[in-house]
A protein has these predicted regions:
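Membrane-embedded alpha-helical segments of multi-pass transporters/permeases
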Residues: 29, 64, 92, 119-122
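Membrane-helix boundary elements
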Residues: 6-46
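Non-cytosolic membrane-interface motifs at loop->transmembrane helix junctions
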Residues: 37-46, 75-79, 99-110
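Short, Lys/Arg-rich, polar N-terminal cytosolic tail immediately upstream
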Residues: 1-7, 132
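Hydrophobic alpha-helical segments of small multi-pass membrane proteins
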Residues: 77-91, 107-118
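Membrane-helix boundary connector in multi-pass membrane proteins
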Residues: 88-106, 123-124
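Membrane-water interface at the C-terminal end of transmembrane alpha helices
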Residues: 113-133
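Core segments of alpha-helical transmembrane spans in multipass integral membrane proteins
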Residues: 19-28, 44-68, 79-85
Length: 133
């Protein structure tokens, strides 16, 4: 893959990650009660719920910023790997313990797809540095 294609690919991956993430996460700000009804019991610690939501929203904005200049933010990508890996691990452990059902899997599985794309971006961009020909 050429340098220009690697950067363009990275741009689109992070732009889409940010947009999709904002579309998925923003409604959670308004769904606390709905979640409590559809997946009892109700949320008993709203500070944890909203803390999770606003941190997730913050990362989506970070993805949009990274999309503007992916090569510049290359050193940050391993941290993004953790952001996309740790939640699925937590959900799969909770499932193994019988504390959540498979209904909790779509979000973590999507995170693993984004993880694969982020790793692909990292591998491709590491071969390229601005100013190299």
């Amino acid at each position: 893959m050429s340098d220009e294609k690697a950067v363009r690919f990275a741009h689109w991956v992070f732009l889409l990650a940010g947009i999709v993430g904002l579309i998925e996460v923003t409604p959670l700000l308004f769904l606390e009660n709905v979640i409590g009804v559809r997946q009892p019991p109700p949320i008993t610690h709203p500070e944890f719920y909203y803390g999770f939501v606003v941190i997730a929203l913050t990362w989506q904005i970070a993805f949009l910023i990274i999309a503007l200049d992916p090569a510049r933010y290359l050193p940050l990508l391993p941290v993004l790997f953790l952001e996309k890996l740790l939640y699925p691990i937590a959900v799969f452990v909770l499932y193994a313990q019988g504390r959540v059902t498979a209904q909790a899997f779509p979000g973590p599985i999507l995170d693993l797809v984004w993880l694969a794309l982020f790793v692909t971006v990292w591998v491709r961009l590491r071969r390229w540095r601005p100013g190299n020909t």
